[in-house]
Amino acid sequence: MSILRYTASLDNTITNAFEENLTTRGTGSNMGLADTLEVFSIYAQATSASVELSRFLIQFPTSQISTDRTAGTLPASGSVTWKLKLYNAPHYNTVPRSFDLQVSAVSASWQEGTGLDMEGYTDLTDDGIGSNWLNANNSFTSASVTFSLQGGANKAAMSGQSFVLTDSDGTSQTFTFNIANDTVTDGTIGMSSDSNTTDIINTIKSAINDTSLSTLDITASTITAAGDADSEMKLLIKQKSTGLAGNTAIDLSGVAHLSLSGSTFGFSSGDGTWASIGGDYDSTIVKTQSFDTGLEDLEIDVSDIVEKWLLGSSPWPNYGFGVRLTDTYEGYFSSSTGENTATEIHNTSGAQDSYYTKKFFGRGTEFFFKRPVLEAQFNDTKKDDRSNFILSSSVLPAADNLNKLYLYNYVRGRLRDVAGSDTAVVSIQLFQSSGSVPEGSAKTFKASGSDTGVTTLNATRESTGIYFVNIHAESSVVSTTFPNLVDVWTHSSAQFFTGSAFTPKAHSPYQAKSDKTYVMTMTNLRTEYRNDQTARLRVYAREKNWSPNIYTTANSTPENLTITSGSYRLLRIADELEVLPYGTGSVKYSELSYDVSGNYLDLDMSLLEPGYQYGFKFSIYDDFTQTYVEQPYLFKFRVIK
């Protein structure tokens, strides 16, 4: 199965829209338990210049994703496409047309909350649990930083050097060291009389706390000495206001003997209120999707954001996604200060028009297939050419002369690496056979990308216990006496597995376009499956109007045609809802695998809602028209708990 779906763990809509009185804004409202998520912009409703906005936040559990990747259920970074999927929620209000939504990573921790009211905005957090337009959470703390002054610091080396402190309101102050005086006003740190680090650190504290800097909302407090009066000194500096806006940067790289302790950035641990009203978002990666009718679902590739969350060394913190209208479609508002007001966002590129209202189903919806999901799409198709081994031909492209052979090392029903090591060297040899056992000496074949004949080739480890080789073989490897090949696998000079004999085929061109039609069935499909199962389902196919000869008539198993390029989709029978579409684009996540027994697929039944009947449809690629042709068959089964 090449799809994994992760449902949201948190979601909430935040807004600065007016309540029904068109006077009070709902900036303190929370909608964390509502079953829909809402985005809109209302222009000039309360006044000729008023703007009302709605945005939403949504988070997915990367801890579970990391667990799946470690277990090998999810492929490595670079092999997975991550899609954020949100489903349109019909409603009785107007729907905007022709607009763009943007998705970006939220850059601060937020709380979901328990609000429900999306009309009157009456479910206020009152600075309690839950995010809203103003607050990310209720952990109201002020940011702090600790300066470390090196023991025995030379004040002469520090003279003339500067650093800048910025408070949560954005007010900045430059502080400059000076050994010519003892002034501690207006940002001067006068050290003329200082004789040791105790004196210097106290002077820094006095300069920061001086009343001449009344607009700087920062205070220096506790001093801690490592030893005597000239030892290392630490000074705790705090923002006076709580909130994320206090987490401002400090650069001490240009100051001798002075450094940050316990931080490389600056102020940290400020929490509670957003740094910017309406939420804090990372601007380095922004994804957009255009909507035409306004009734579309959202499906957007967020792979680079998710993979940054999953980085092993220095991951981004996962605070989820923020979804909103782009600046162009959010309402126009020009603040007299050029900054956001207490409730409205300064946006001079915005629209002087309304876009009301786009809704998506939230994580609390009762509709199983409308829940927001973070979908991992990847191609884990296995194409084992044992039953479709082609002998090399000069009329075939190099890629089509290659044949892929797999080895699966199952131990007590579970895949295990050979010798228990992911670095174990496994090799393959091919032998002629007149029946089912290897005969004679190993035959010569060629590896992928090589013109040199070999008799032994080291395999590639694809994943735990799964190995493969890509080879091409000339027609001389078989004969009328020995028409079959047998693969023998070796580790540490010991043969440990002999495969079943298979008969290579010679390429034969057609004189005209091949108009093939097929008969298909699913040979092991049961009527019911539990929703905690993953089932391997076999697909049998043969050409329609196939005429068996005396051999195939006498054979107990009918000839099984290997479909080299086929895909499947899933429908819910009750309403024909497509719950899994064909994956025939750049990521072929629903492509059929095949091995010596024919085609198959693996389906994780937890993707499906119990209590319903579902049906498979299949599509086979037609090389002549270069399109997938859906077959006229529907194979039904039911999922139960």
Give, region by region, the residue ranges found by the protein language model.
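Extended, beta-strand-rich, solvent-exposed assembly scaffolds of outer structural proteins
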Residues: 142-252
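A short beta-turn/strand-edge loop motif at beta-sheet boundaries
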Residues: 74, 92-95, 154-157, 368, ...
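A beta-strand/beta-hairpin structural motif
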Residues: 297-304, 460-474, 581-609
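Secreted, disulfide-rich extracellular signaling modules
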Residues: 1-144, 253, 261-480, 511, ...
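Short beta-strand elements
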Residues: 366-368, 491-529, 622-641
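Internal, hydrophobic beta-strand segments that form the core of beta-sheet-rich folds
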Residues: 320-328, 480-493, 565-566, 600-602, ...
